[in-house]
């Protein structure tokens, strides 16, 4: 965890994190004005694993995801109660540098959103903003990030071409590479393949499986087969509540809750 994440000394001691967990969510509730969107969620997120969040539209899974790096702060009516511990520090606290937090917990959205700049400039934009000016360092990070995102071989000869000239699937992998360039520990993916064709979707899934060796990944998906293919653990949300959370195979083959079984079997959603 970067020291830059803490703006000032915490008011109370940092809690020793649980072994093998990158995040600990404790009694988290999220509100939009007077409407409660997420109700008292408790869950631990494993390191170097893929955690899938599933559930019908409006169940709270994306709201929950966006709160992990405080993207909900951008919504004036949004507020959160409870704790999200990252390396033992409550990242919902007022002493948190949110910009630094979002470097360590990066996010990729449903629709690819490359900047209207070159492929190279998309990767280096945030790095330069953070003060990095050494071209050799920037070149190295660009190649490393694009390689991790399985895009380097496709674009290495046109790095200074517009990112908007890439296909939708390539643009999404570029957005992943742009996030990886900031060297996050956690990667949040909000339905990253839902707007893509089947071939691009398969590439994104293959990429996710490979990235968990270095990153802890949380993915929101409406595609239950995708959750089954790529995730190690699955959380089922319904009406803002965490109904069931466990190993993906167990959730899909022998869920403990009837609501989970009904959703998995397509009885609603």
UniProtKB/Swiss-Prot annotation:
Major subcellular location class: membrane
GO cellular component: plasma membrane
Assembly and binders: The complex is composed of two ATP-binding proteins (PstB), two transmembrane proteins (PstC and PstA) and a solute-binding protein (PstS).
Annotated family: Belongs to the ABC transporter superfamily. Phosphate importer (TC 3.A.1.7) family.
Function recorded in the entry: Part of the ABC transporter complex PstSACB involved in phosphate import. Responsible for energy coupling to the transport system.
Annotated localization: Cell membrane
Keywords: ATP-binding, Cell membrane, Membrane, Nucleotide-binding, Phosphate transport, Translocase, Transport
InterPro entries assigned to the protein according to its UniProt record, in alphabetical order: AAA+_ATPase (IPR003593), ABC_transporter-like_ATP-bd (IPR003439), ABC_transporter-like_CS (IPR017871), P-loop_NTPase (IPR027417), PstB-like (IPR005670)
Origin: domain of life: Bacteria
EC number: 7.3.2.1
Name of protein: Phosphate import ATP-binding protein PstB 2
Reactions this protein catalyses: phosphate(out) + ATP + H2O = ADP + 2 phosphate(in) + H(+)
Occurrences of domain ABC transporter (ranges): 23-264
GO terms (BP aspect): phosphate ion transmembrane transport
Bilayer topology: Peripheral membrane protein
Gene name linked to the record: pstB2
Binding site residues for ATP: 55-62
Gene Ontology molecular functions: ATP binding; ATP hydrolysis activity; ATPase-coupled phosphate ion transmembrane transporter activity
């Amino acid at each position: 965890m970067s020291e830059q994440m803490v703006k000032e000394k915490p008011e109370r001691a940092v809690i020793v994190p649980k072994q093998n967990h990158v995040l600990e969510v404790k009694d988290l509730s999220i509100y939009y004005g007077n409407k409660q969107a997420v109700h008292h969620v408790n869950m631990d997120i494993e390191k170097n694993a893929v955690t899938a969040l599933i559930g019908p539209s409006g169940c709270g899974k994306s709201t929950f995801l966006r709160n992990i790096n405080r993207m909900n702060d951008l919504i004036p009516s949004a507020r959160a109660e409870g704790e999200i511990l990252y390396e033992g520090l409550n990242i919902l606290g007022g002493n948190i540098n949110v910009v630094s937090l979002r470097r360590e917990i990066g996010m990729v959205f449903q629709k690819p959103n490359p900047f209207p700049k070159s492929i190279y400039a998309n990767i280096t934009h945030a790095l330069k903003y953070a003060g990095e000016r050494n071209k050799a360092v920037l070149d190295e990070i660009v190649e490393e990030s694009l390689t991790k995102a399985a895009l380097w071989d496709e674009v290495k000869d046109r790095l200074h071409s517009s990112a908007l000239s890439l296909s939708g699937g390539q643009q999404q992998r570029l957005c992943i590479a742009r996030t990886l360039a900031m060297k996050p520990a956690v990667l949040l993916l909000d339905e990253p393949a839902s707007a893509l064709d089947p071939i691009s979707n398969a590439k994104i899934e293959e990429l996710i499986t490979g990235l968990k060796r270095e990153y802890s990944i949380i993915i929101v998906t409406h595609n239950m087969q995708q959750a089954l293919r790529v995730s190690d653990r699955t959380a089922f949300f319904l009406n803002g509540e965490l109904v069931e959370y466990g190993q993906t195979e167990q959730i899909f083959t022998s869920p403990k809750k009837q609501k989970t079984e009904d959703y998995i079997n397509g009885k609603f959603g």
